């Protein structure tokens, strides 16, 4: 009899462990509907002349305190070079959710850190994003992402896993099977890169983003969170201004309230003067000056008009 009970207990143990993990995991639909996401790279982090300056835990805490009055959820791009400090700082400040990013799906450090962080912060980390536009840039392959996906899944059966690419890859038939394996769609939908784009036409730009999101939802069954979209606030020589940036975000938030199946994350937290040089390495052929100006806050931590614009829209809901 004792032997039978022991065998029964061993058989039920995995189910019990899974149930505990599921109970701790955040509800994706509820988070998408209620969270105020923003993509976040610490101001203390930079890449200059090929040299990476890691983010500091003190700098991260300062950043998250500044963001907290208007945002309660974060999307990061890496979990190495200091960004592994983000979840602990966010938890102390009462953030609702984090989508932890892995920049390089082949990085052993990032893979191990993502697993460790998700286990340590099960109520905070809602998903892990394995890569950002690296398939499009040909820095890694779908097979690389899938390999890391399955490795993390074995360790974290209840955490949503995904990746992030430009929206047009999701619409190519050769990628349908790949993206269908993801638990969440996390596309980047940038109207600024379309040939028809006009910085002063906020309504058309916002409508484009939401139409693309709807098209993706008609193709895939998963919930969708637009990871990147928006307008940079400069440089003025390119036609981008703080007023145009603010108008776009006011328009897209007016047109689309978040739901359990679709939401839009703000992009991004802070200006990053070092990004144009790095972007030129990824995508040569342009100076990419606007990459320094996507922030809702300047590199000095000063809020732009867009912050007040989204606050006013949210206040009317």
Predicted regions and their residues:
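Bacterial N-terminal signal peptides
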Residues: 8-17
